[in-house]
């Protein structure tokens, strides 16, 4: 009753008010009272942030799920820093790095991935969300919409591509450089490999 009264009074003042709830006191019923859910504290722990935001995505239906604030050390290489973003790609990112303290390649990486997220948020947040194997901490995650598939790999697994997808983004968020995927039928494809700062490192049309 108290939560209903609080919600009603707040929305009467501001109909589009944002009300956030955080783990661990979140469940499907809380969608009645809040329109933002946020993962539990995961300081400098990309894997924990991924697990908690994915758990929330499974429970929250169309309620916006926000990551916990993520940071990294300025002396980390840019690939390691990028993992903080790639592990929460299927939630609303909450960057907590002091931009004036990080090197230029880190800034370029942030610009690239935040632009990517904004351009693809209708897929990442509103598309068909496919989490894999929760017992293994979700070794890959996918989202599909409008004939586009976005799959992020966190472990060395073989990805099966959606046969209806006309564009597929495979994102490598693991320690090894190799990515293995399986096509279910012959197809013509244009292959482009991009580094974590958005630079094209390989491009080929496959007939």
What residue spans do the PLM features occupy?
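Active-site-proximal substrate-binding groove within the catalytic cores of carbohydrate-active enzymes
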Residues: 2-206
């Amino acid at each position: 009753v108290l939560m209903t009264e609080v919600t009603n009074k707040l929305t009467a003042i501001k109909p589009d008010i944002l009300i956030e709830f955080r783990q661990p006191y979140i469940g499907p019923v809380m969608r009645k009272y809040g329109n933002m859910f946020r993962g539990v504290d995961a300081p400098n722990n990309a894997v924990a942030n991924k697990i908690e935001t994915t758990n929330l995505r499974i429970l929250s239906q169309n309620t916006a799920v926000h990551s916990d604030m993520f940071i990294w050390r300025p002396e980390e290489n840019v690939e390691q820093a990028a993992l903080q973003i790639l592990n929460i790609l299927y939630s609303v990112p909450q960057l907590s790095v002091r931009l004036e303290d990080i090197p230029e390649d880190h800034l370029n990486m942030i610009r690239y991935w935040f632009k990517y997220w904004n351009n693809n948020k209708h897929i990442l947040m509103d598309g068909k969300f496919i989490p894999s194997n929760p017992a293994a901490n979700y070794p890959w995650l996918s989202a599909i919409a409008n004939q586009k598939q976005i799959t992020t790999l966190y472990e060395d697994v073989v990805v099966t591509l959606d046969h209806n997808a006309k564009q597929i983004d495979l994102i490598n968020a693991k320690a090894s450089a190799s990515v293995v995927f399986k096509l279910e039928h012959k197809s013509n494809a244009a292959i482009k490999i991009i580094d974590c700062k958005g630079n094209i490192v390989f491009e080929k049309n496959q007939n």
